[in-house]
Swiss-Prot record:
It is found in: Cytoplasm. This is Imidazoleglycerol-phosphate dehydratase. Its EC number is 4.2.1.19. Belongs to the imidazoleglycerol-phosphate dehydratase family. It catalyses: D-erythro-1-(imidazol-4-yl)glycerol 3-phosphate = 3-(imidazol-4-yl)-2-oxopropyl phosphate + H2O. It is an enzyme of class 4 (lyase).
Amino acid sequence: MRAFKVTRDTNETKIHLELNIDGTGKYAITTGIAFFDHVLSSFAKHGAFDLKLDVLGDLEIDDHHTVEDVGIVLGKAFENMEKKNIKRFGWAIIPMDEAKASVSVDIGGRPYVVGDYTPSTEKIGNFSTENVVHFFESFSNNAKINLHFEVTGENEHHKVEALFKAFGVAMDMATQIDERKGIVSTKGVI
């Protein structure tokens, strides 16, 4: 079983995360940001990852530190994963009503994000939409994965939710075990 626990305790956030990559999509998520809980739940459900996440953040300031640090901790959990025999690459195109999101990932040890997301509103509930790209940058830098995404649509809720669902599906695909593969790199290491 590929299960990991990661904690982060700073002056800005206190986070405890438990991730089972070989899960069934069970989740218990409390960040203090209702919409962020919602899209992280969608990530876990559609990625078939069991995810438990308890966060106490400095939300009296704003949601930036909480969103950033969740990306860091979730990224570290995936970075801890054994890379031997994984498929390495994953992708998904997910519609949600008028919105469509595409995500492709490479778990190749090279962090890089290319994202096309322009929010039309500043907030969804108490979640700042400017933090969407920053979440993925924080995740990618700590998971050491290459991540590309694009989002189109009109409704901001639909756009961000479709993006997190596509992220879950792409990560599920990339983390699947294929015994034929060994280390999926001509270098011999990831």
